Amino acid sequence: MDKEQLTTVVEKMLNSIGFKTARVSFRGGCFDLVATRQILLLFIKTLVNIDKFTEEQAEDLKRLAKLFRASALLVGLRTKNIELEDGVVYERFGIYAVNPETLFSILAGTEYPLVMAERGGFFVRIDGERLRELREKYGYSTTELAEMLGVSRKSVQRYEKGEGMVSIDVAIRLEEIFDEPLVKPIDIFKAKIEKVTLSSPPENELEKEVFDRLERLGMSVVKIKRAPFNAVTKEEDEEVNLLTGIDEKKTPSTIRRVRLVNQIAEFVESEGVFVLNEKKTEVVGKVPIIPKDILNKVRDVDELMEIIKELRSST
């Protein structure tokens, strides 16, 4: 199965369980599918080999998840050495990765996996607070419990603090000792995005000019390197994001990017706009293409959004 076939499989699977999807074919992009069902919004990257996922793609994907209050996910078939196992969660640069079968099991039956693949084997997460309660209830010291498990006292202390993962053998032994489930399911829709930085420098002079202008108008600008748009911009305290594309001139590649942004904007309930170093104004789909000169002349964000609204309604 190649990447295109994998993306098709994932998209059809999502559609079969009630998701609306938008496919985003953009070379080197940080996501290939946008999917939504009720309040769940997913940005999904598909790769046959998840080891080809880059840190730059991961950072962009985490930025998008944070900006849109969405979930970021990697769906693949194998690493460079092994196939991804059913019911097992993998991780690349803070983004959870699963195979299509595992994703279907989660979304169709809300059965979250228990096992995480890390260096050295398979591990699970323990409910540390419950473990401490049970240890104290049964009257074991941390040293006594450590001896029963064949681990160090510091390891038991880490388990109780919820720090790190626990080997499957140790988890089984704990549940045998206390006769109670202690393994916590892994919520793959909660990627580690809390520490992602939203600041990233522009890549060229035109980007810098446009970003500086938008910031002077009072908008925040978050650079996205691996997407059809160059940045996500928004006015402070406003909910609507503006997917902002930038290019020197209109080319077939530009139009293709505009069409992708038009498709994405609908799913993430946002507006789209492209700023070009040209004189002509036009609209592709519902996305206006405006000259940089127009952007330079607007007085505030309200005027910019009014221009975008008027251009959209003119089609």
UniProtKB/Swiss-Prot annotation:
Keywords tagged on the record: DNA-binding, Transcription, Transcription regulation
Residue ranges for the DNA-binding region feature of this UniProt entry: 142-161
HTH cro/C1-type domain boundaries: 131-189
One GO MF term: DNA binding
InterPro entries: Arc_TR_HTH (IPR020886), Cro/C1-type_HTH (IPR001387), Lambda_DNA-bd_dom_sf (IPR010982)
SUPFAM superfamilies the record matches: lambda repressor-like DNA-binding domains (SSF47413)
CDD domains to which the protein is assigned, alphabetical: HTH_XRE
Listed NCBIfam families: PRK04140.1 (NF003162)
UniProt-recorded name of the protein: Putative HTH-type transcriptional regulatory protein PF1851
